Amino acid sequence: MIPTNDAHITLMNYDDPLEWAQSVTRELENILLQEITQRGRASLLLSGGTTPALVYETLATRPLDWSKIDIGLVDERWLSPQDKDSNAWLVRHTLLEHAKHATFLPLIRPGKTLNQCVHDANLQITHSPPPCAVVLGMGNDGHTASLFPGSLDLQKAINTPQPYVALDATGCPGAGVWPLRITLTPAGLNNIPHRLLLLRGKQKLKVLETALSCKDALDYPIRTAIDLPNARLRVHWCA
C-alpha cells in the first residue's frame, strides 16, 4: 500500500464515485475562488480520458464566475477539436456544456501544423499568469499527460524547458491509434501550484504503487509529476 506519510504525494481514498467527484470539485472550486479573489482571474488545465468526466460535470454546476476562468488542456491528440475522440470534445461536452461563460483554450487550431500549435501553446502559457491548478490522469502503463513509456521523444519531453512539446508515441500501446500528441511537460507542470491526480479502480492504485517504488520516469512517466518540487501531488483515488 501507499504510505500515508509519503513525501511526494497526499492520497485520499473514496468508495463512492459521487463522493469522489464532489470532493475533487470542492477542492477545485476553492482553488479557483481564491485565485479569482487574489488575481482577478483563474486558469485551470484539464486532462482527457474517461476518468475525469464525472468531476467536470459536477464542477460545471458550481456557481463560479466562469467569465473569469480560462480552461486549457494538459494534452491533446492530433485531431480536430470537433472530433469526438479529442480531449477538447470531452471538456466541451462535460464542463463547458453548462459553464458556458468560461474561456476555452484548445491546443489544436484548425489550419495550423502540429509544430505551429505547440508554438502557440507555449506563447499562450508563457505570456499569461500560470494556471493555478491542473487535473492529471494516469494510464495503466504509468503515463500521464501524453508522456508515454517507450516513446522515442520521452527523454526530450522530460528534459525540455518548454511548457509544451509535440510527441510521437508510435508503437506505444497506451497511445492507441493517435500517436501524434501535444503534451504538457514537467517544466510546464512545475509552475502550477495545485496538482491533482484522479484515479479510479484498484489497477490504477497498483500502478501508482509500482511507480513510487520504481523511481525511473522513463518506465513510469507519472514519476515526473510525483518528483516535482514545490507542491505535493494530491491523489484522489476511488475504488
From Swiss-Prot:
One Pfam family name from the record?
A: Glucosamine_iso
Task: Give the enzyme class.
Answer: hydrolase
The biological processes this protein is annotated with in GO are: carbohydrate metabolic process; pentose-phosphate shunt
* Record key words, sorted: Hydrolase
Give the pathway listed in the UniProt entry for this protein: Carbohydrate degradation; pentose phosphate pathway; D-ribulose 5-phosphate from D-glucose 6-phosphate (oxidative stage): step 2/3
- Key word Hydrolase present: yes
- The source's domain of life comes to Bacteria
User: Which EC number applies?
Assistant: 3.1.1.31
The GO terms this record gives for MF are:
6-phosphogluconolactonase activity
Q: Which reaction does it catalyse?
A: 6-phospho-D-glucono-1,5-lactone + H2O = 6-phospho-D-gluconate + H(+)
Question: Per the similarity annotation, which family is this?
Answer: Belongs to the glucosamine/galactosamine-6-phosphate isomerase family. 6-phosphogluconolactonase subfamily.
PANTHER family according to UniProt: 6-PHOSPHOGLUCONOLACTONASE
Q: What does this protein do?
A: Hydrolysis of 6-phosphogluconolactone to 6-phosphogluconate.
> What is the name listed in the Swiss-Prot or TrEMBL entry for this protein?
6-phosphogluconolactonase
Species of origin: Xylella fastidiosa (strain Temecula1 / ATCC 700964)
* Gene assigned in the entry: pgl
